[in-house]
């Protein structure tokens, strides 16, 4: 009792005292320490996600599929709202690197693969593939997933599925893996060995109206063509050889690309880039050009479609010159494609197309002038480099067109307002000195169609007309 009274007196008197018991704060209850330790042990890596909760969710998934196996073989797996919600949480969690690694260590890919193989529920399949897709966003887990040959086989088979969300997640996962340099060769080899992949992608492009799916399939195909030229040659050759890919009237690769591009034109025009690039890549190999030329109707259809894009959608007269910066990724493959087709199909050049080519060079000149006036060369150096290929392609194509130009077409261009003094000077400045012959032919025609403009070009650029041309 005395000891207790002394302690009270010391505290009341603000004295620290000498007793060890009074030199420290009271210890927390032991159960709080244990709770904190348990929570730390249960956390996945540096996250707040619970290992126990994740184990429980995956266990419920396994149990649900196991129970389903005991029922009719053709029945759909019943996915409860609660389990679907929890699996979607796992899907989101898998975007965290610590969670992705933990799922890999816990053999979650094998569990998900088993569910995909046994499930007849499209939503469940979509979620499982989506989880794997998020896991593949990290290098180490992507490498591990790619080494699973069974998973690779199942994913390629899923390209033949008829559920758009599942197809979307499958394409996303494949594209993610193909973007990893370490594992891309593994996936390319698998795809080369599965001829059904080509027909599956063609079927999607030619029949689907799902914009997100068409965009992702286009990105996947463009990546495949960009990474493996031999695969591209094989697919375009097989599509036009009447062999196994065509036995069931399956669409060929060219018509499928065109059909998907038409679908996206109004829905998602920015997504046309990958389709235009894929078509342009086909013109860089002999097999691709042969397919376009031998099937003249398809080649002409591609020409007509891309001309419409250029003349009606891209880089229009009422657009500001800066539109060239926004649309350069679309314009570059489009013009390269048109240039290749023109030289092989000897297509007709309309006044509208000629006007579009001139306008691109005019907008480029105006952008360059504004950058110079604003002393902003440094800030636009990268953009100028990106535009270089577009301007060169446009100039080369325009040169070829001008060398074949007839007076009636030029007259139509002038009357429609596509060729003013400003646009003509801009175009000629881009064409010289590499394409002098084309400029001479233009000046020669202008001497009859618009003598004043002809004299301006002669004077400004010291160009003489070439009447013999």
UniProtKB/Swiss-Prot annotation:
Highest taxon of source: Eukaryota
GO BP field: positive regulation of synoviocyte proliferation
Presence of the UniProt keyword Cell membrane in the record: no
Species whose genome carries this gene: Danio rerio (Zebrafish)
Region (Disordered): 1-39
Protein function: Plays a role in promoting cell proliferation in response to pro-inflammatory stimuli.
Compartments in which it is found: Nucleus
Name of the protein in its database record: Protein saal1
UniProt entry keywords in alphabetical sequence: Nucleus
Family according to the record: Belongs to the SAAL1 family.
Extent of Acidic residues compositional bias: 30-39
GO CC annotation: nucleoplasm
Gene3D superfamilies (UniProt xref): Leucine-rich Repeat Variant
Recorded coiled-coil stretches: none
Signal peptide residues on this chain, from the entry's feature table: none
